[in-house]
């Protein structure tokens, strides 16, 4: 493993080409959700599994934890990355990450399904296109 110093160009990747991204990271915030659904660990596990399938992803493992007095965290480990959900039923709020890698992934379908399943009356969605080093333009290939 090579260690790079701050400001050093990653010369091994300086081919000047830029390929299209293959990874998307969706950051979804759900507001005014059904508080009972946000506190139902079994329900949340079920919808994460279904969301992964809608995104064309393969679930490798699904773990969850119910907190006292309320709230759940659940994470679906995917062959293509992950989907996670953290809930605050007392605030009718949930934070969701959907990170997928690959050409045939449809994380937007998973996002829409989760919005509907949790009955969110409002939501915020940010999409980040993740780029492996070979897809990053030469001018931004410096280590910060």
Pin down the residues of each PLM region.
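Polybasic/polar functional segments that serve as interface/processing modules
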Residues: 1-144
């Amino acid at each position: 493993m090579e260690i790079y110093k701050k400001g050093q160009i990653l010369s091994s990747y300086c081919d000047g080409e830029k390929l299209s991204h293959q990874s998307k990271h969706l950051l979804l915030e759900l507001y005014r959700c059904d508080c009972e659904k946000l506190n139902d660990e079994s329900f949340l596990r079920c919808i994460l599994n279904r969301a992964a399938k809608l995104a064309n992803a393969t679930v490798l493992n699904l773990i969850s934890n119910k907190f006292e007095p309320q709230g759940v965290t659940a994470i679906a480990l995917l062959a293509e990355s992950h989907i996670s959900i953290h809930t605050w039923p007392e605030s009718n709020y949930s934070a969701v990450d959907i990170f997928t890698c690959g050409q045939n992934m449809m994380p937007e379908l998973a996002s829409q399904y989760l919005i509907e399943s949790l009955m969110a009356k409002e939501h915020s969605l940010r999409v980040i296109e993740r780029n492996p080093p070979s897809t990053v333009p030469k001018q931004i290939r410096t280590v910060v």
